[in-house]
Amino acid sequence: MNTFKTIALLLVGTVSSLMLMGCGEIDTGTETSAWEKETATIVPEEPETEIILGDIGGASTLQEAVADFNGKNNGITIIIHDYYEENISDGISRLYDDILTGKGPDIISFSTDEMDVEVLREKGAIENLIPYLEKSDVIGEEDIVDSAYQVLTADGGLYMLPTNFVLYTLITKEKWCSNKENFTFEEALRAVRECEEDPMISRDLFLQEGAICGGYSGETEDNRLEQYIKIAEQLPQQAMFQTNDLLMREGKIPFNLECIGDMQQYLYKKSVWGEDAVYTGFPGAEGKGRIFIFDNCFAINSQSTHKEEAWKFVESYFTEEGQKTIAPNWNFSILQDVLDQQLSDSRKQEYYQTSDGKREKLPILTYEIGSTYENVYAAQDEDIQDVREMINNTKVMQRSDLPLIGITQAEALYYFNGEKSIEETAAAIRNKIDEMPNAKNAQPDMDVIINIGDFSVSLYAVSYTHLRAHETRRHL
């Protein structure tokens, strides 16, 4: 169509020129006419490469990144396919279906609190990105925060590349946790039993995150399972939203699960809980009991015919310009040098001059607690060191495909309702785990939004039965 338009415009232009010159001046000899000279140089345009990017929710930042990429790359057009319709869990199910049936998309965009790529990795549906890193001039293995990279490559390959992350961590008081490096079962149980107010974390969430970070298992010799259930018994069935921050400061709430994505969040929660606040992890867990939630993650479909072009888009987030314009760096960056700068910037204290000439610190935020207002100021060296240690010691990431979670949550209800003893409950959980030879590949049904403190975390997964049904359809 573009070629015909070009010829038509040239023809109109040539005829107009002839009319201006006069018909008597037309050369009827054997020389090549002007029109023939012009049309001889026309070359058909190369068709554009269309890349489909599958997303759930269509974040404005992603749309901006795609628009920026399309504007800078001739011949490549990325089109966003938003799988979200009536709810996120159905959207995730459709996305899994399209990937596993070979329909696409070329690029998958997600967060690890939305979906889990483990099933896709095991089925060979997504690319190992290590070879792409090895030949990239933009980002390499050495550029990524080491603890995060070790978690991302725990299975021997890199099947998703996030741009940012946040940390799940518990926060409590020194009187409940004497050593932040090890929140013991005895301390946690004493805290939930002796506190005047209910914790804000629910039973299901405590059991879920405890399983994810390796706080307990279904192994026969692992008695941590019973201890987690005993602690969960003291927790509310539903997550509590507490508006009275004084209860935290006064130690009347045992602990809470916090999502720390930058130094300001860290400093704010530490201030609310008071000078004796302690950031710690889940009892008995790996990596000091904390969890990575990777954000703005990208995976490449192994059946895509445009893998290099897809990688070029993913890579654009990690250029110097991309880090300044499209990467959501309000959360911790996955790039070590950018993270270092984020932490360093948080210690910069600004000042202002009062009307009487005094130089005063400018707070980074002010909040109300009780009937007073309190200020939070720039980070101190010990704050930055604490956050560095939290990041460096984290060894697991948010997952939703562990069968242990759903089984434990379901069976523990019998104990909570007084229908089974703790021994009977633990035995039932272990038996069900043992009955699942492919338990690692199975996923529990989860479609919940759990409110945690003053933020919400969405936790979704495709059900085991759905994946099994899909696997059956593939082989028909």
Residues of each region from the PLM?
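C-terminal motif of bacterial Sec signal peptides marking the signal peptidase cleavage site
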Residues: 21-22
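Extracytoplasmic/periplasmic substrate-binding proteins
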Residues: 235-312, 333
